[in-house]
Amino acid sequence: MKSKNNKFIAMSIPFILGTALGIYVESTYYFTSIINQKSFALPDTQIKHYSIPELSRRNVSTCFTPPAGCTKFIVQQLEKAEESIYMQAYGMSDSLITTALINAQMRGVKVKILLDRSNLKQKFSKLYELQQAKIDVGIDTVPGIAHNKVIIIDKKKVITGSFNFTVAADKRNAENVILIEDQQLAESYLQNWFSRKASNSVHF
């Protein structure tokens, strides 16, 4: 009798596992389908929609590394700033970008920066150099890592992408930079900047 029960259990296990796997796969497919159909979305206050035709009418430029050259691309845009530069950065150790920010401050451009907390201990971070130049620098503290790479220029240009503002990003890594000239998009990024500044930053 015991032998028959063991045989029944042994035969049942594959069936149970197979059924469970089938339910899992079917459920995964169902929820993936829902997400792909955009039935699931963040609240409208947290997500902005821009159609491809809409963006195609904007002035959009891109830069990729390798080869090197995206730092120069960013510096050129910073040199064109007339009124304001708002930056969010995880890594901030590139001398050329730092110099461009300081020069902008010296010619009367409002420069405000939010950096990840790692810059407090990073050996090559330009945090204190920026601070000494009287630039408004804040540390984005919570939650987690402040991994944004964003520059908003004159409230009408947005530079973003994977590119940290470091030498490694320009010389060693495979990175991308995108520049979009659009006032509505810039406003969206600015709102996020001020939100981060108000709730999650330590001011020097």
Swiss-Prot record:
EC number(s) per entry: 3.1.4.4
PROSITE patterns the record matches: PLD (PS50035)
Active site residues of this protein: 147, 149, 154
Subcellular location(s) of the protein: Secreted
GO BP annotations listed: lipid catabolic process; phosphorus metabolic process
Top EC category: hydrolase
InterPro entries assigned: PLD-like_dom, PLD_domain, PLipase_D/transphosphatidylase
GO molecular function terms listed in the Swiss-Prot or TrEMBL record: phospholipase D activity; RNA endonuclease activity, producing 5'-phosphomonoesters
Catalytic activity: a 1,2-diacyl-sn-glycero-3-phosphocholine + H2O = a 1,2-diacyl-sn-glycero-3-phosphate + choline + H(+)
UniProt entry keywords in alphabetical sequence: Hydrolase, Lipid degradation, Lipid metabolism, Secreted, Signal, Virulence
PLD phosphodiesterase domain ranges (all copies): 142-169
Signal as UniProt keyword: yes
Assembly behavior: Homodimer.
Free-text function comment from the UniProt entry: Could be a virulence factor.
Family: Belongs to the phospholipase D family.
Protein name, per record: Phospholipase D
